[in-house]
Regions:
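Non-catalytic, usually N-terminal nucleic-acid engagement modules in DNA/RNA processing proteins
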Residues: 1-108
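Catalytic cores of enzyme domains
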Residues: 100-184
C-alpha cells in the first residue's frame, strides 16, 4: 500500500460515506439535511522515530503524557497524518455571525468529528487488510483525553494530539488559536 492507495481510499470514503453528510435525523434545520461536511483530505507521512515527536513530550508542547509512535506500536515505521478541509458551504456559513457559530459549522464540529473517527477506523482496517501492522491512537483503549488539573491554566489535552502530529509530519503549522493551518 502506498500514498496514492491511501489517497484513493480516502477519496472514496469522503464521497460515499454517510458520515460525511448531515442526516435528516440530525439536521438542525431541514435545509441542512444532506449537507456535505468535508472535502478530500490532505496527507503527510512522518517517520515514527522523528525527533519532533520526542519534543512533543515537553510541557511547552503537549507534555510528558504524550505517547510516542513507538509507545503506541513498537514496530511503527510511518505515521500517517491527515486533515479534512470543510466544504465551502461550512466555511462561508460561519462568516454570517461574528459571535455565534453557524449551524453548518456546528454540524462540522460534531458530526464531522464522528466522520473523522469512522475514517480513522476504516483506513486502519484497510491497512491491516493489506497485511501491514496498523493502529489508530484515537481509537485505541489507551487513548486519554481530558483536563490537566495540576497546572495553572487547566489545559485540555490528550496523549495523542492529531494537530501536533500533523505539525511534526509537515502537514501545517499553528495559528494564534492553536489550531493547525494547512495549505487547504
Amino acid at each position: 500500500m502506498n500514498k496514492l492507495d491511501i489517497a484513493r481510499i480516502a477519496q472514496e470514503f469522503v464521497l460515499n460515506s454517510d458520515y460525511n453528510y448531515v442526516s435528516k435525523e440530525n439536521a438542525l434545520t431541514e435545509e441542512l439535511a444532506g449537507m456535505k461536511i468535508f472535502e478530500e483530505p490532505i496527507f503527510a507521512f512522518g517517520a515514527a522515530d522523528d525527533e519532533g515527536f520526542q519534543l512533543l513530550k515537553n510541557p511547552q508542547a503537549v507534555g510528558e503524557h504524550f505517547l510516542l509512535p513507538k509507545e503506541w506500536m513498537l514496530s511503527a515505521n510511518t505515521v500517517i497524518s491527515f486533515f479534512f478541509p470543510f466544504t465551502d458551504e461550512v466555511i462561508k456559513s460561519n462568516r454570517k455571525d461574528n459571535y455565534w457559530p453557524s449551524d453548518e459549522w456546528l454540524h462540522g464540529r460534531i458530526e464531522g468529528q464522528n466522520f473523522i473517527k469512522e475514517f480513522s477506523i476504516f483506513l486502519n482496517s484497510k491497512i491491516i487488510d493489506e497485511g501491514y501492522e496498523s493502529l489508530a491512537p484515537t481509537s485505541d483503549a489507551r487513548f486519554r483525553l481530558g483536563c490537566i488539573r495540576d497546572n495553572e491554566i487547566n489545559d485540555f489535552t490528550s496523549n495523542w494530539s492529531e494537530r501536533h502530529v500533523a505539525y511534526v509530519c509537515g502537514l501545517g503549522t499553528f495559528g494564534l488559536s492553536k489550531g493547525i493551518i494547512t495549505e487547504r
